[in-house]
């Protein structure tokens, strides 16, 4: 469009010059040379404009790729805590047990004893198990005779009906209670420890100076791997919170130093 405008404009100038200069025309070569220069200038202008647009487009693409890469890194950090389960056969579950802590058990039978290396004094189980561990109980009673007491009283038990939990991202997920693996489905059990009561003694935790401190027994949680699903899909191993201990929480009384 601009080239056509240049040609028309030059033709107009040539007509004016022919009238004003006693009908003398410009040399044909100089006119052609001027037209060629104008055309080249217009082509160069369009080329530079296109190059600028290409640079802007490439810059926008680079910025978008960087932003997408950052988002992917964030998603991968979250997904790194999630191990999907493709098949629910027994062999795969046996391989995936490395994701479990001792507090998580996959079994076709209800567990009757605490996990290995866990104390039995606070285990809430059957009388048969308690009779089997009478020697350990006598040892615990012997400790109490020496004046050793727990600040808080706790109890531990296998939770057999856990249906939901909070994962490491703060999302609520569904805990798989029963997993079908061929002819023998297995269930998922959680060994949890919690406080028996908030105040084992009148003023709070046992053995705390109540003149200067407020105290209360509180159940503490930690993360374990468990088979879960989110929104009825994405079945896999996730970190979830369960009750694992009982601690004494202290706060200084106002006006006390």
UniProtKB/Swiss-Prot annotation:
GO terms for cellular component: extracellular region. Disulfide bonds join 152-217, 195-246, 205-248. This is Neurotrophin-3. Belongs to the NGF-beta family. Coiled coil: none annotated. Seems to promote the survival of visceral and proprioceptive sensory neurons. InterPro entries: Cystine-knot_cytokine, Nerve_growth_factor-like, Nerve_growth_factor-rel, Nerve_growth_factor_CS, Neurotrophin-3, NTF3_N. Keywords: Cleavage on pair of basic residues, Disulfide bond, Glycoprotein, Growth factor, Secreted, Signal. Residues 19-138 form a propeptide. GO terms for molecular function: growth factor activity; neurotrophin receptor binding. In the embryo, the expression peak at E4.5 and decreases at later stages of development. The keyword Nucleus does not apply. It comes from Gallus gallus (Chicken). Glycans are attached at residue 131. It is found in: Secreted.
């Amino acid at each position: 469009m601009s080239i056509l405008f240049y040609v028309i404009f030059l033709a107009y100038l040539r007509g004016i010059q022919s009238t004003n200069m006693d009908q003398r025309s410009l040399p044909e070569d100089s006119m052609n040379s001027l037209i060629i220069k104008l055309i080249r200038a217009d082509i160069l202008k369009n080329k530079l404009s296109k190059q600028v647009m290409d640079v802007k487009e490439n810059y926008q693409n680079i910025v978008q790729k960087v932003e997408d890469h950052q988002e992917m890194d964030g998603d991968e950090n979250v997904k790194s805590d999630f191990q999907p389960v493709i098949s629910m056969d027994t062999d795969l579950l046996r391989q995936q047990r490395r994701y479990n802590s001792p507090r998580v058990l996959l079994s076709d039978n209800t567990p009757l004893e605490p996990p290995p290396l866990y104390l039995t004094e606070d285990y809430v189980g059957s009388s048969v198990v308690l009779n089997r561990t009478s020697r350990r109980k006598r040892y615990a009673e012997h400790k109490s005779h020496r004046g050793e007491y727990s600040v808080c009283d706790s109890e531990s038990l296998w939770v057999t009906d856990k249906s939901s939990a909070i994962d490491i991202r703060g999302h609520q997920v569904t805990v798989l209670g029963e997993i079908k693996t061929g002819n023998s489905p297995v269930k998922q059990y959680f060994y949890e420890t919690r406080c028996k009561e908030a105040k084992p003694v009148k003023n709070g935790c046992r053995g705390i100076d109540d003149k200067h401190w407020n105290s209360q027994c509180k159940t503490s949680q930690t993360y374990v791997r468990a088979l879960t699903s989110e929104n009825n899909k994405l079945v896999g191993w996730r970190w979830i919170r369960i009750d694992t201990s009982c601690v004494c929480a202290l706060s200084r009384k106002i006006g006390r130093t």
